[in-house]
């Protein structure tokens, strides 16, 4: 009985956690959901955002925000690259307000400042777990 109880607790704690997509399984965000920052910039940098598999809200898109404007609508297992000008950028994630289902009715607004230099590359993951909910973190090489 204790073993069953321990297994139940473990499944509840890890049940909504996401996991990193294997590089060969990452899909690009389709062009119709890439809304800005797609033109190459000679003196800019690149931001790559990927979304883990599984987790809470797996059936919903998440809005990727650059300088507080929607740059893409990203699904699970997808990745997008953004070409951004040099300077301090604000990278964030939020609710996909283009979605008129329950997915677009929640609350999510996380931002972080990012210093972009010419030729720099920055990578981030959108993750989920039972404690933090949905969040974005830099990819550790």
Task: Locate predicted features.
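Short loop/turn and low-complexity linker motifs enriched in small/turn-promoting residues
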Residues: 16-141
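Sec-dependent bacterial lipoprotein signal peptides
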Residues: 1-18
